[in-house]
């Protein structure tokens, strides 16, 4: 084998050096052959003093090296597989010299001993199979699975193509132009193509471009191989010859062969000194054995106690040691567990079926057993659950944690907030003083003159009555064409005007009571019609409201101005200055709320969109703000900036009414779900306090203008007077104390108190009810 390798080297040198002679080559070959001969005599030992075999005859190191091209691709083994051009030349030379090699080797074998020839025969290694040379110019990913080099016409990416079903195009090309879908044929076209086109069976549709593609023979072959569960590439060889990259022969050689140092053979001087010191310590009694040392440490530590499951260094663990908690005692047996229980403890058929029905859910049973009755104690059988109950008891004793809980004996009065006594909060109404009778149907609304001398009421009997508060005498009755829903006296003391909402008309009435000069001034103001030539009204306003002067017949009743609306009016409210008033029409959609100006006889629609079914509106007493209450929420608008300021969340089903504190920082809301809500406008958009003082729907609430009082009326025929103090200190919360429950109205058709109103000067409250009366509480 070595000689054959030398031949190959010689042939390669001949290819590189053309001027070398044939005789020199043979001499060089003989010299190289002599260099590889063994140098020992037969039977001579080749091991050295350390027992290492110095005889080492190795194959050429070039057989274990490999060649690669510039790109790092495998080309072949050095001395084994060369470039294609070199291989042809070497093969030709080897064919010519095969005979000479055989003769020379035969002579050599005859001269050498038999053992050496066998060794050479065994050491010969079969040549490794040649690998195909790789072309460096070939692209790295030419035959791989990468899709980077694919020619993709449609650049939409990996998306579902059915997204383009609604469009005429199916994607975009590299230039950004749309790829138009091809024309689709019908079933007849498909049938003709199936008959006439010989390539119809190998035609498929490209989902990316929508074009029809004819499969080539290579594609058909690839599909067939995949369908038959074979490797797609036909050129791929599954069973390639194994290349032994690493030799299987283990070579044992020493890493280093350094002789031992002299001190390794001599005793250690330091150990000698240490032993002498230890001997001296033993003689003097200074040194002790390990057992003696451990015994002394144990005596110092003393006996050691520890918990079975965990350490006892924690506070709870120390408490368990020093202050153990005894196990709770089992409950004593009851009458149901007796062998002869009373008949009422035995199950009937219904209870027995229910007990057996809960077999899969035994924890839902009231008793874990079924009571039985025996004539005598000796007839009682063994208890089947005895072992299980003992086992569960043991589990509870050592697995369940124990703790002492101090029972808090809290007095109920301690939980009630400390409120001042009602006697300290006087004055407030306590008794019924007057009953105003005269209406024949429900009295829905009541309002008091700013000076507190007269009162006006509206009823379902289509009348408006003006009363003298002190005497209870009805001074005047004004008949209307429809049910009176709401009445409101102008808060401006310089005017004597009553706004009456009856049906879809709003009547401005001069009651003709009180100061005659004031009555004449009011008539002059209402009789004067301002010139609105420069003002162009919107069509929405014209169709929603119309101003007109009352006719002679109504003038005699005191009606001066009539404002006709397009829907029935439910509520009317005045601004604090008495020049503006607002009306509510729940059926008016986005025109439900209207604001009227008395001096200019103009109307405005503040909202263009409906935010809900409007129930009532209110003017702020100090700021230019407008409160709008829908069924569930309350919105506060700025009339100057014309924007929403705040939205109050009531968390109620239906709002019935609202009233604002004279200072303007607190709002009281009544709801049909038996609640009263107190809102602190500076604090939050949610109720500061929710009061459930009534048993039925709360229909009306009202603040007093001077005293810290508010009242509420409900369908339970009760008027509840409460104390509501608002402090100037913003850090102090309002004080709310219920004071008195006044219940004198009669209930009719499930209706009770419909409206409440405070006297502007005195701590008196008026209430109207379904019993056709108006009652004064003082």
Swiss-Prot record:
Family statement drawn from the similarity comment of this UniProt entry: Belongs to the WD repeat BOP1/ERB1 family.
Superkingdom assignment: Eukaryota
Any GO BP: regulation of hemocyte proliferation
Subcellular location: Nucleus, Nucleolus; Nucleus, Nucleoplasm
Segments of skewed composition (Acidic residues): 44-53, 60-72, 84-105, 142-151
Gene3D superfamilies xref list: YVTN repeat-like/Quinoprotein amine dehydrogenase (2.130.10.10)
Molecular function as annotated in GO: ribonucleoprotein complex binding
Keywords from the named record: Nucleus, Repeat, Ribosome biogenesis, rRNA processing, WD repeat
Residues in WD repeats: 438-479, 481-519, 564-606, 609-647, 650-689, 693-732, 748-778
SMART domains linked: BOP1NT, WD40
Segments for region (Disordered): 1-152
Its job: Required for maturation of ribosomal RNAs and formation of the large ribosomal subunit.
Keyword Repeat: yes
Any one cellular-component term (Gene Ontology): PeBoW complex
Name of the protein described by the UniProt record: Ribosome biogenesis protein BOP1 homolog
Ranges of Polar residues composition bias in the record: 114-124
Coiled-coil intervals: none
InterPro entries per record: BOP1/Erb1 (IPR028598), BOP1_N_dom (IPR012953), WD40/YVTN_repeat-like_dom_sf (IPR015943), WD40_repeat_CS (IPR019775), WD40_repeat_dom_sf (IPR036322), WD40_rpt (IPR001680)
A Pfam family recorded for this sequence: WD40
Biased composition (Basic residues): 1-10
